[in-house]
């Protein structure tokens, strides 16, 4: 979940929240075919303001589109529409949690395992859902084949932070 993106565009924020949770689980060795999502949503009090009503609608549409694009469905969630106190409002918030059942032999962790291991950055050709799904499929295949010893998804943190965390480990 990226609060800065969600404040600017609730649709994009929710879409990216789903993408990030799916990518993290793929990087951990789980397959999208076995994944499910659950959401936690927080929004300002809607009152009678049509613009306020549009924020949760946009977020839900973004999350729905991501589910369709990545073939992963949500099985539940919890929402709060009372995220306001006097003049303070929470940013539009849709947090996505991904879970899956998988084979323990496929589970990977992000820390680098040994000196001399090859480090590879895999990136999508573009931001189209088909390109993202092809990248997920390739990662699922490489992890299943035992080629990947460590794997991490960079998400909003960026590549540099992800590499430092992989190098430092637990």
Please place each PLM-identified region on the residue numbering:
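Glycine/proline-enriched, intrinsically flexible loops and inter-domain linkers
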Residues: 1-170
């Amino acid at each position: 979940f990226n609060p800065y993106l969600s404040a600017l565009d609730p649709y994009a924020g929710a879409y990216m929240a789903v993408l990030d949770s799916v990518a993290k689980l793929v990087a951990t060795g789980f397959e999208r075919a076995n994944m499910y999502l659950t959401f936690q949503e927080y929004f300002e009090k809607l009152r009678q303001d049509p613009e306020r009503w549009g924020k949760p609608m946009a977020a839900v549409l973004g999350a729905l589109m991501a589910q369709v694009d990545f073939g992963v469905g949500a099985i539940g969630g919890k929402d709060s529409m009372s995220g306001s106190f006097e003049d303070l409002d929470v940013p539009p918030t849709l947090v996505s949690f991904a879970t899956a059942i998988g084979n323990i032999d496929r589970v990977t962790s992000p820390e680098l395992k040994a000196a001399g291991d090859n480090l590879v950055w895999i990136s999508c050709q573009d931001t189209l859902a088909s390109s993202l799904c092809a990248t997920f499929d390739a990662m699922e295949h490489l992890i299943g084949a035992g080629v990947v010893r460590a794997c991490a998804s960079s998400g909003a943190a960026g590549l540099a932070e992800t590499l430092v965390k992989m190098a430092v480990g637990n």
